[in-house]
Amino acid sequence: LTGRYDAGSVIPATVEAHDEEYGLTNLSFTGGVLRVPRVKALKGASVRVRIRARDVSLALQKPEGISQINILQGKISEIGSPRNEHDGSPPHDIDICVDIGVPLWVRITRWSLDQMELSEGKEVYALIKSTSIDRQSLGQQAQNMEKIG
């Protein structure tokens, strides 16, 4: 987990396949597969995917018929303490770590935490929009990049 406003997770992954029709790349990692916007890297290349905690939603059941294509099952491994706001108002958000094969940090409101009755050990589904993972969120080794031009 990194800084307050940019908190997130870094997931090591491997380029599994490119979907030329839709401009997506499948990245395999210990917990499954992420579909992200096209990565300019060769199949088999190692990449690191940065996912911001604020870009992840949680569900208690596997959702269907939604636009988010990255739906990963996991278990809550840690619930952080609410942070006090600098303006003196009560804290409204909280960071949660979900084990999806690797640690994935999620930032939700305390209201959602209470309404969903979330607790450590509870099974959840993490939802990550593919469009929230941009090229700046992907780090890769130079020798594995495709030649352009």
Predicted regions and their residues:
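Internal alpha/beta loop-helix hairpins
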Residues: 1-33, 54
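Residue-level preference for beta-strand/loop junctions
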Residues: 7, 43, 68, 90-92, ...
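Short coil/loop residues immediately preceding or within conserved phosphate-binding loops
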Residues: 10, 71, 93-95, 103
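Hydrophobic beta-strand positions in extracellular immunoglobulin-like domains
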Residues: 15, 76-78, 100
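Short, conserved beta-turn/loop elements at beta-strand boundaries and strand-helix junctions
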Residues: 17-23, 79-92
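Short, acidic/hydrophobic/Gly-rich beta-strand patch recurrent on exposed beta strands
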Residues: 25-30, 95-101, 107
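Glycine/charge-rich catalytic "coupling/switch" loops of P-loop NTPases
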Residues: 31-84, 107-149
